[in-house]
Amino acid sequence: MKKIMLVAAVLLMSAGAASAATTQKWTAGWDNFGEPLNLTKSKIIWSVDPTTKKLSVTFKLVSATPSKLYQVAINFFCSTFPPTFGQFLNDQGGGACVPLTRQGVTLDVAEVELGVVTTDIHGNGSFTVVIGPVLSGTYQLEFFARNGAGCDLIGGASCDPDHAEADFQSPGPTFGDATMITIP
Amino acid sequence: MKRIFLMVVALLLSVIAASAATTQKWTAGWDNFSEPLNYNKSKITWSVNPTTSKLSVTFKLVGATPSKLYQVTIHFFCTTFPPTFGQFPTETNNGACVTITRQGVTASVAAVELGVVTTDINGNGTFAVVVGPVASGTYTIEFVARNGAGCGLVGGGPCDTNHAAGDFQSPGPTFGDTTTITIP
């Protein structure tokens, strides 16, 4: 009986470790600051499974523009970056990170496109992605949602300012405000 | 004790009813027939929650074109159709379903754009959506994955032949092969 209790406790603890999630809010920008969004109800939830080295991210938008595609991506703040992050391509192809200036802040970045949030008639939508296995390390990053879909992916709009611009960033409110994610 | 047992059984039954899922395969077409896909591993899983009148659908693509956007839709076979299906707008001619011909089959349809599957470097991707509450009824439908993203939505590519064409259909293999979904 004691052994069963111990096994149950270990199972519960491992489940807890895998599912401990961080929730963070969206903020406006870093390119567009007039795109509608309920900043109180919209959020990003992410968690790391230390066993599988997988990062799960859910992007939730509430009261954005109805029936619109928002491509969601990660900007990593880095000096060099591998060609992939999990199973997704580094837009820059790997190697030296590229300087980018937004909101008066210049930083070297690598970008990874994860998918698309499609909104309904209320402007609500969500998208969940599981990335990995990811190389062990500590990543300084900022999530963002573009003003359309197609940048560095086949089958969407052209990657012009209209579609590439960031409508929402997280954590923000300023380009470069970063979240730290550690993959053990 | 008997009452508790009955309650547990009722709870279990309701959970089973809500989660009973149907899985169906993709087939090629109805416009493009050479788009890569692992048809054995790719699938659509859907279920109806009779209590909430919500339809849950998960689209899974395996071995498709890497780093590509596939907009996923439902085509309803109909004569007339309401302006919305759950929280998504429908594409009709003022309520009248639109006649289209594919693979030599002519039928009247209304389309609903649900979201986008974004593939990774291996051509794999998933997208899950919960639609509803949906008006009670029996719906005769076919799922489609378009050759890009943007049709009927803001922020994507143009709704031209390149982006709108059906790469994969389900059930198939012929336009007009249908699935029946009943919302009680």
Segment roles from a protein language model:
Chain B
Residues 20-184:
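N-terminal leader/targeting pre-sequences
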Residues 7-15:
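Bacterial N-terminal signal peptides
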Residues 1-4:
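Positively charged n-region of N-terminal signal peptides that target proteins for export
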